[in-house]
């Protein structure tokens, strides 16, 4: 069975595992999913990410991060641009998530980057998701 929106599936798996206080979640791999997971790691939302090669498409293993008393680091994660309704933003109108406390993940000509990087490089693109 084919999946309509694999990025939404990635975000939903992370959101559900986070809400259930799981330590690890495994997700079917793709290039854009790897990029999104690496951004979440570099921004400190997840502890680690590793790619496991199988003889099909591979698996991304995401290690979730929790604070003191098992408080969630990821408070919210939301898909913005969907297959049925794409959302684009120019470099000067990129969104700020929670006044800069969260990040927007943007797919640009320079690759998949955060809103802060896109502003510094002066590139716009498709607004994939918000994470806070």
Swiss-Prot record:
PROSITE patterns: RIBOSOMAL_S8. GO terms for cellular component: ribonucleoprotein complex; ribosome. Keywords: Ribonucleoprotein, Ribosomal protein, RNA-binding, rRNA-binding. Signal peptide: none annotated. It holds the Pfam family Ribosomal_S8. GO terms for molecular function: rRNA binding; structural constituent of ribosome. GO terms for biological process: translation. One of the primary rRNA binding proteins, it binds directly to 16S rRNA central domain where it helps coordinate assembly of the platform of the 30S subunit. Belongs to the universal ribosomal protein uS8 family. Part of the 30S ribosomal subunit. Contacts proteins S5 and S12. This is Small ribosomal subunit protein uS8. It comes from Leuconostoc citreum (strain KM20).
């Amino acid at each position: 069975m084919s999946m309509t929106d694999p990025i939404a599936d990635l975000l939903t798996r992370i959101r559900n595992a986070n809400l259930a206080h799981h330590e690890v979640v495994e997700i079917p791999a793709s290039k854009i999913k790897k990029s999104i997971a690496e951004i979440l790691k570099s921004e400190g939302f997840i502890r680690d990410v590793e790619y496991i090669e199988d003889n099909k498409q591979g698996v991304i293993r995401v290690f979730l991060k929790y604070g003191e008393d098992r408080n969630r680091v990821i408070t919210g994660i939301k898909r913005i641009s969907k297959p049925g309704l794409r959302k684009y933003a120019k470099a000067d109108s990129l969104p700020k998530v929670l006044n800069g406390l969260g990040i927007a993940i943007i797919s640009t000509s320079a690759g998949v980057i955060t809103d802060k990087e896109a502003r510094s490089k002066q590139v716009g693109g498709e607004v994939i998701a918000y994470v806070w």
